[in-house]
Amino acid sequence: MAKNVVITGATSGIGEAIARAYLEQGENVVLTGRRTARLETLKSEFAETFPNQTVWTFPLDV
């Protein structure tokens, strides 16, 4: 069973790399960040690359 992993700051850099690593391991991810457009772009890219995982996005500033 896949785990659901929450990642803050997922729109670039380390956060984006961590999200990709978890998806490669078969986990689902919850992406959060301030840049709404970038979150939606990543969601689309990840859905195409990892069709068996679920990606949720929530714009927020921690």
Q: What does each model-found stretch correspond to?
A:
Residues 15-16:
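N-terminal Rossmann-fold NAD(P) dinucleotide-binding loop
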Residues 49-62:
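Rossmann-fold cofactor-recognition segment
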Residues 25-42:
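Conserved glycine-rich Rossmann-like NAD(P)H-binding loop of the short-chain dehydrogenase/reductase
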Residues 2:
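Phosphate-coordination loops involved in phosphoryl transfer and adenosine-cofactor binding
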Residues 22:
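Aromatic pocket-lining residues of Rossmann-like dinucleotide-binding sites
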